[in-house]
Amino acid sequence: MPGIVVFRRRWSVGSDDLVLPAIFLFLLHTTWFVILSVVLFGLVYNPHEACSLNLVDHGRGYLGILLSCMIAEMAIIWLSMRGGILYTEPRDSMQYVLYVRLAILVIEFIYAIVGIVWLTQYYTSCNDLTAKNVTLGMVVCNWVVILSVCITVLCVFDPTGRTFVKLRATKRRQRNLRTYNLRHRLEEGQATSWSRRLKVFLCCTRTKDSQSDAYSEIAYLFAEFFRDLDIVPSDIIAGLVLLRQRQRAKRNAVLDEANNDILAFLSGMPVTRNTKYLDLKNSQEMLRYKEVCYYMLFALAAYGWPMYLMRKPACGLCQLARSCSCCLCPARPRFAPGVTIEEDNCCGCNAIAIRRHFLDENMTAVDIVYTSCHDAVYETPFYVAVDHDKKKVVISIRGTLSPKDALTDLTGDAERLPVEGHHGTWLGHKGMVLSAEYIKKKLEQEMVLSQAFGRDLGRGTKHYGLIVVGHSLGAGTAAILSFLLRPQYPTLKCFAYSPPGGLLSEDAMEYSKEFVTAVVLGKDLVPRIGLSQLEGFRRQLLDVLQRSTKPKWRIIVGATKCIPKSELPEEVEVTTLASTRLWTHPSDLTIALSASTPLYPPGRIIHVVHNHPAEQCCCCEQEEPTYFAIWGDNKAFNEVIISPAMLHEHLPYVVMEGLNKVLENYNKGKTALLSAAKVMVSPTEVDLTPELIFQQQPLPTGPPMPTGLALELPTADHRNSSVRSKSQSEMSLEGFSEGRLLSPVVAAAARQDPVELLLLSTQERLAAELQARRAPLATMESLSDTESLYSFDSRRSSGFRSIRGSPSLHAVLERDEGHLFYIDPAIPEENPSLSSRTELLAADSLSKHSQDTQPLEAALGSGGVTPERPPSAAANDEEEEVGGGGGGPASRGELALHNGRLGDSPSPQVLEFAEFIDSLFNLDSKSSSFQDLYCMVVPESPTSDYAEGPKSPSQQEILLRAQFEPNLVPKPPRLFAGSADPSSGISLSPSFPLSSSGELMDLTPTGLSSQECLAADKIRTSTPTGHGASPAKQDELVISAR
């Protein structure tokens, strides 16, 4: 709430902040009230002892004081828990209760003095031990309470509180001139107050001119940021809790919407179809990513001995102590003669820690050339090393580790980059621009780079490349230093880890993408804060505080992990509150900082995100997240994402662990992901053994009206689907009625191989899925890592699940169960070395061989009735045999086996589907977009290989409505393929991290109008012999892969 006004002065504490202090004092005074009551009325005192009589009189008076304190504190607790953060009317009487409590405190002070007098007179002479101990306890307790109150008053004292109250009163009287004067006095007073706080914060440091300037700039920045802002520190804490809940609610609402392209949120960032994952299957991309991980070690080493001991608290101290030579120890040579160390401590701990860091990582080919431990405002420590393995000279700059570094961080105004030819157009963070200029000047004065490139001419150090790295403050300084050094070193590269968000202007940011690679981990706070980002954060914080109706203590308590409770009001309530309470502080939401140039993070950003499991209670063990690497947009880091990890994920060793986990997930999940992908498209997997067992199914009694083909999978859990790898393939044909003629559809289907029937039957399942259900939406963060593989298949698939036994499809199959024939192939042994194309081609040839070597009567089994073929179908076969059929083998009855494999040419349907699977899972190292993979069209050819009756109006209406009604078609799965395996950290493609199943349901690809989607698509013409076209071909829905 706004600061409470007591004694006509504003204080930096709210009336709703007194709940916990009042509860603490109430419990303390209640305890003493009980103890003193027992001592006074439960014990018998000697009437001849003067000390005992004085104790009784003093105790009775103190009982009355304790009772008054308890009543006043109960009133404070009751009032503090009323109202909301900015709804202060129920707490208006708080100041009068405080007046009463302060009066009681004065009486307590007097009684504490009396207690000290009693102790000095009777403590040694009094024989009553109980009286002495009780009096001593009361006096100590009184003085502790009095000192606590005095310290609290000093902490919450606002030097500008009197001016603030006058300014608010003058605003109400609309005196413009006096308002301007009071506002100016208020800003000056706040700047002076902030400057005093900074000096107290850095009380042990020597003040220089540059440091004094930094004090002034930062003080005015804070004064401008908090000017006219009547909130207290606890309000900011409650606002962060509310803002986090609002952000999570917005993300869930976006995922629940049907008309958007956002598929999921990873680490708070939206994942769309255009999200680009790092293609770690590409050798060049993998080398580049490993290079990023490698140079993170140099950035980590720049922090010296504090970070070394933080990473290795047990043995790190012993390893440093063995190499250290303190000023009291005899000097001994510790470094090579060519190493320069500037302003290290007497033991040389920083330089030794840097060297030990590389030795522990087995990087013995790294030589340290220069180490500067000089630390001041705008002067950041750094070191220069030569890496003979990589043939690079590395400049590593330390991040924020001292209060002086914090002053450099906070000096965030825009400053022109001192680069020739770009005066005024390239801007950067002022503190880091000055730090980069200092390092460049130091390198030139000490000729450090000349020493590094001439370190060992025999190894060719003269031709080594230059690398600049840094983390946090060092990352921003390294990026700007790269601008300054690039004219002399055109091949320079820079790796900036967790760089600040307000670093470069837009023009400079675009240019930095040529040589700067930045890394951001998860919800890191630093890459998302700059002056422009803080303005938006300030407005959001004030807005969420105004909309809240709950007491502050409930909001803060509800933020604990084990008591999740959303305190956001409902939307209807929010609108009414916003309109009725806006007058309370009309200027707060309209106040903005001085016009600041938007600044962005540098370079090409690798954003390491993770699919975090669902939060569990504090008593449950949390699952490990799965990490992925995507290419981030510099302008997307414009909002602070409130999270408990926003500070933790900025630590340098945490960033290094995140980078390494991406590689670990990739290495562990590379084989498992391909196996899982094959299980998802199991209709294309047919056992490669030459034996195919046809089993006769029970014949239906009803009239045969075949409507399609279904793949029958076991109803067990998908987790056990790969167990069937060694079983034999079994196919069953069903739907041939005894004593009846087969329809032309069944006759045509009997002449086709089972694989082609499986592929072409997908169209009917898709139509059934469109009618039966809509794909559910789900957030990524709601899925655990262990179930992400199966969620990818069973919960998210919309296309292939239709031919794998989805619940909605089973309802369709049960209605027409008597008119279907089933194929139940076993899943073959999962061999990652076999691509889907190899399996498809072999399976296609195998199925042709089985059909041609065995007549249909044998397939139906003994005792079965051979159906008569319609005259139209027989005529088509004769025409195909005469016409040659377009490139098929010369004889259908002759199939050659070469090296144990079938040598027949596969059908175009299988070839096309194989290319579709290969491009989908990137088995041939191809990269294409989702829009180029799928297209669902309605052919205009009047004939079809499978004659069907004209489509019903309802089916045609579904196809047409699907082009214009997005809600009719389930959205693509809100999951990326990288989580298909719990330990997998890779995506199936750099451009589409999604499964193919969900995308098949998208009837309107981006960039195609509904008319184009309904345009004609010619049926394939190059069919093998024996697969001719039927003259009665109708329009049907087919799937084609471009």
From Swiss-Prot:
Subcellular location: Cell membrane; Postsynaptic density membrane; Early endosome membrane; Cell projection, Dendritic spine membrane
Carbohydrate-modified residues: 133
Extracellular side: 44-60, 123-136
An individual GO BP term: monoacylglycerol biosynthetic process
Family matches, as Pfam families: Lipase_3
Post-translational modification Phosphoserine, affected residues: 727, 729, 732, 743, 782, 784, 806, 808, 833, 847, 952
Recorded topology in the membrane: Multi-pass membrane protein
Disease annotated for this entry: Spinocerebellar ataxia 20: Spinocerebellar ataxia is a clinically and genetically heterogeneous group of cerebellar disorders. Patients show progressive incoordination of gait and often poor coordination of hands, speech and eye movements, due to degeneration of the cerebellum with variable involvement of the brainstem and spinal cord. SCA20 is an autosomal dominant, adult-onset form characterized by dysarthria due to spasmodic dysphonia followed by slowly progressive ataxia. Neuroocular syndrome 2, paroxysmal type: A form of neuroocular syndrome, a group of disorders characterized by developmental delay, impaired intellectual development and ocular anomalies as primary findings. NOC2 is an autosomal dominant form characterized by eye deviation or nystagmus with abnormal head posturing apparent from birth or early infancy. Affected individuals also have hypotonia, mild developmental delay, dysarthria, and gait ataxia. Most patients have mildly impaired intellectual development.
Record-annotated active site: 472 (charge relay system), 524 (charge relay system)
Region (Disordered): 846-903, 1014-1042
Phosphothreonine, modified sites: 1023
Subunit and interaction comment: Interacts (via C-terminal) with CAMK2A; leading to the phosphorylation and inhibition of DAGLA enzymatic activity. Interacts (via PPXXF motif) with HOMER1 and HOMER2; this interaction is required for DAGLA membrane localization.
Organism: Homo sapiens (Human)
Record-level GO cellular component terms: cytoplasm; dendrite membrane; dendritic spine membrane; early endosome membrane; plasma membrane; postsynaptic density membrane; postsynaptic membrane; varicosity
Annotated transmembrane regions: 23-43, 61-81, 102-122, 137-157
Keywords tagged on the record: Calcium, Cell membrane, Cell projection, Disease variant, Endosome, Glycoprotein, Hydrolase, Intellectual disability, Lipid degradation, Lipid metabolism, Membrane, Metal-binding, Neurodegeneration, Phosphoprotein, Postsynaptic cell membrane, Spinocerebellar ataxia, Synapse, Transmembrane, Transmembrane helix
Protein name: Diacylglycerol lipase-alpha
Family assignment from sequence similarity: Belongs to the AB hydrolase superfamily. Lipase family.
Species lineage: Eukaryota, Metazoa, Chordata, Craniata, Vertebrata
Gene: DAGLA
Function noted in UniProt: Serine hydrolase that hydrolyzes arachidonic acid-esterified diacylglycerols (DAGs) to produce the principal endocannabinoid, 2-arachidonoylglycerol (2-AG). Preferentially hydrolyzes sn-1 fatty acids from diacylglycerols (DAG) that contain arachidonic acid (AA) esterified at the sn-2 position to biosynthesize 2-AG. Has negligible activity against other lipids including monoacylglycerols and phospholipids. Plays a key role in regulating 2-AG signaling in the central nervous system (CNS). Regulates 2-AG involved in retrograde suppression at central synapses.
Documented EC number(s): 3.1.1.116
